[in-house]
Amino acid sequence: MSEHHNGTEASLSSEQRARAEMVKLGASFFQRGYATGSAGNLSLLLDDGTLLATPTGSCLGELDAERLSKVSLSGEWISGDKPSKEVSFHLSIYRNDPECKAIVHLHSTYLTALSCLEGLDTQDAIKPFTPYVVMRVGKVPVVPYYRPGDARLGEDLAKLASRYKAFLLANHGPVVTGKNLRAAADNMEELEETAKLIFILGDRKIRYLTADDIAELS
C-alpha cells in the first residue's frame, strides 16, 4: 500500500513539474518576442503516456498550469481546457517518432518569414552555414501550405516524423521536436536565430558548410 502510494506521489510530482515547466517556457517565449497573442502551441509526453498541451486560444505568456489540456495519444480530450486544434498534428508526430517527447510550434518572426519565401529547398529549407543547426536538428523539410487544422498537415508530418526533428510549415511557421520540452525549446531558438542570420546576410555570399564539414558534425 505504501509503495503504491509513494509511486502515485512521484507520478503526480512529475506531472506537476511538467506543467510548471510548460508555463515557464511559454512565458519566456512570450516575454522575449518569440510568441505573440495566442499564436503557437507547446506539448509534451507525460510519464503515463498522455499528452500535456497548451489549450486553444491560449497566450503562451499567460498559461495556467492547472488548465493545460490533457489528451490521450488517440486524441481524446481527458482534462483541462479544450486543446488547440493543432494538437492533432502534434499527435501525428508523437505516433511516428518514438524519440520525440516534446514539441514546440511557434509563429516566430524570422522562421515564419522564411516559410513565406518561394523557391525554398523542400528537402532542407536551411542550408547549413553554422554547425549548430546540423548538431541540433539536421535537415529542415518544408511541409506544403494547408489551412490551420487541416488533417493533411498531420498526414504529411506523419510521413516525415521518423526522419526529421524540425519542420517548416509553408506560410505558417516552424515545428520543432526534442527529447524534452527544454531541448525542443532550445532547438527552436537555434533555428529562429539561424533564420534571422539568413535575412541579415541577405544577398551577401555565404560560406556554406561543405559535405565533409557536415559529416564531422552528424
From Swiss-Prot:
Zn(2+) binds at E86, H105, H107, H172. GO terms for molecular function: aldehyde-lyase activity; metal ion binding. Its EC number is 4.1.1.104. It catalyses: 3-dehydro-4-O-phospho-D-erythronate + H(+) = dihydroxyacetone phosphate + CO2; 3-dehydro-4-O-phospho-L-erythronate + H(+) = dihydroxyacetone phosphate + CO2. Keywords: Carbohydrate metabolism, Lyase, Metal-binding, Zinc. It is an enzyme of class 4 (lyase). Its cofactor is Zn(2+). This is 3-oxo-tetronate 4-phosphate decarboxylase. It comes from the Bacteria. The gene is otnC. Gene3D superfamilies: Class II aldolase/adducin N-terminal domain (3.40.225.10). The keyword Zinc applies. The active site is at E86, Y132. InterPro entries: Aldolase_class_II_sugar_metab (IPR050197), Aldolase_II/adducin_N (IPR001303), Aldolase_II/adducin_N_sf (IPR036409), OtnC (IPR050013). Coiled coil: none annotated. GO terms for biological process: pentose catabolic process. Binds 1 zinc ion per subunit. Belongs to the aldolase class II family. AraD/FucA subfamily. GO terms for cellular component: cytosol. Catalyzes the decarboxylation of 3-oxo-tetronate 4-phosphate to dihydroxyacetone phosphate (DHAP) and CO(2).
